[in-house]
């Protein structure tokens, strides 16, 4: 039923070519995000809030500790597993290219846009984030602000935000 409903939406907008080309990368584009502050109201946005260009509270609350964040929002394994492979097959499907020994390779590109997982890069310097239990401050349960699931939220956070208290820019 969900697939049928999604197909109806795609048909309604004129097929795949009618979908916005920036849908996957919208949150990566600071200019588009900053335009929201100035009254931009793109049709792709169905839920929004306003944020000033220099406001980094969301990043401070949700970045991993190594990026000077509090790591408050931790996606679950169930959410990560809901992202299909790059061809759209569920990771449990026999046709899937999912590989348990390399679980983040060949996945729907939204996974890397929405979730910080072990080995993903994040932050203004594209720091590699290690979330394993024997990893540094970003590892599972290593600090009070460390992930409790092995993942950190990435969607809606600006990777250009610098939360380092000694940052002067």
Model-predicted regions and their roles:
Residues 1-135:
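An aromatic- and glycine-enriched ligand-binding surface/loop that stacks and positions planar moieties
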Residues 129-168:
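Active-site beta-strand/loop architecture of penicillin-binding DD-peptidases
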